[in-house]
Amino acid sequence: MSERESWHKEIDLFLVAMGYFTRIPMPKWVEADSDKLNKASRYFGLVGLLVGLLSAIVFWLTQNWLPAGVSVLLAMLVGVLLTGGFHEDGLADTFDGFGGGWTAEDKLRIMKDSRLGSYGALALMLALLLKWQLLVELALYDPVVAGSALIVAHTVSRMVSASIIFSEKYVRDDETSKSKPLSQHQGINELLILIASGVLVLLFLKGLAALSLLLVMIGLRRLIIVIFRRQIGGYTGDTLGAAQQIAEIVCYFVLLVVGNIL
């Protein structure tokens, strides 16, 4: 394969990842199949970087003219519009399943139900409120830090979520599931590129903040995996969405705590 063909392949995989995780229209020549989607997992972090960057730009453009809370809300709205609430939906389904089911089979069945239950509604409401409050506090501390936090959290949280594919078992047998292609083994190349995207954005942060966030994310990933194994024996697309949302919130929390210490 020539260098030009290699670059074209990587661009194609990035666009496949962006088409899967966002509502941004893709060129007609971009075709996603199971193999491409599996390999495109290497670029899930970069998709988060794009979403976070656009959200941060909206925040930075409005924060001089609007109250911090409104600017943060607009930035969050941009993120939801770009992704279609894809990960938030996974969070709600996961909490409905984990909260309402007794056995792994019950939990998977409930998670498949498109209706929103009480556990999911509570999780979604609390997650959005937490993100808003943490970002407002970061904005009041320093608007530059708040915008950087959006970029970092959207990227790193997707790195944590997608890296679960590498070590864990996909537990759904439904061939029609949108996440079924992700059940294929994630190669070491996909994992390394994914990790590189997460580490790259840490350059937005000061040394102590970057190191603290990296260590917390490593521990959080392990904790999430333990919970998923105990609850359903592995992961599904919904639980990956939940992992992303949880990791994003923890990112904001860590950056706020470290910022106050500094």
Swiss-Prot record:
Keywords: Cell inner membrane, Cell membrane, Cobalamin biosynthesis, Magnesium, Membrane, Transferase, Transmembrane, Transmembrane helix. The chain crosses the membrane at residues 43-63, 66-86, 120-140, 146-166, 191-211, 242-262. One of its GO terms (molecular function) is cobalamin 5'-phosphate synthase activity. It catalyses: alpha-ribazole + adenosylcob(III)inamide-GDP = adenosylcob(III)alamin + GMP + H(+); alpha-ribazole 5'-phosphate + adenosylcob(III)inamide-GDP = adenosylcob(III)alamin 5'-phosphate + GMP + H(+). InterPro entries: CobS (IPR003805). Its EC number is 2.7.8.26. GO terms for biological process: cobalamin biosynthetic process. It holds the Pfam family CobS. It is a multi-pass membrane protein. It is found in: Cell inner membrane. Its cofactor is Mg(2+). Pathway: Cofactor biosynthesis; adenosylcobalamin biosynthesis; adenosylcobalamin from cob(II)yrinate a,c-diamide: step 7/7. One of its GO terms (cellular component) is plasma membrane. Joins adenosylcobinamide-GDP and alpha-ribazole to generate adenosylcobalamin (Ado-cobalamin). Also synthesizes adenosylcobalamin 5'-phosphate from adenosylcobinamide-GDP and alpha-ribazole 5'-phosphate. Belongs to the CobS family. HAMAP family: CobS. PANTHER family: ADENOSYLCOBINAMIDE-GDP RIBAZOLETRANSFERASE (PTHR34148:SF1). This is Adenosylcobinamide-GDP ribazoletransferase.
